[in-house]
């Protein structure tokens, strides 16, 4: 019989939505020759910040 392991809920990621501009937005990013530019037109639903709607693309 294999030993039991315990998983703690506080380890790793917590469930929930994180603010996009606080976790993924990198304003000082410098483009590279291998980057691909893609443009999307996004209209957020009422009450949704534009950067959050853009993050969903």
Swiss-Prot record:
This is Ribulose bisphosphate carboxylase large chain. Its main location: plastid. One of its GO terms (molecular function) is monooxygenase activity. It comes from Camellia sinensis (Tea plant). InterPro entries: RuBisCO, RuBisCO_lsu_fd_N, RuBisCO_lsu_N_sf. The modification N-acetylproline is found at residue 3. RuBisCO catalyzes two reactions: the carboxylation of D-ribulose 1,5-bisphosphate, the primary event in carbon dioxide fixation, as well as the oxidative fragmentation of the pentose substrate in the photorespiration process. Both reactions occur simultaneously and in competition at the same active site. Belongs to the RuBisCO large chain family. Type I subfamily. It comes from the Eukaryota. It is found in: Plastid, Chloroplast. The keyword Chloroplast applies.
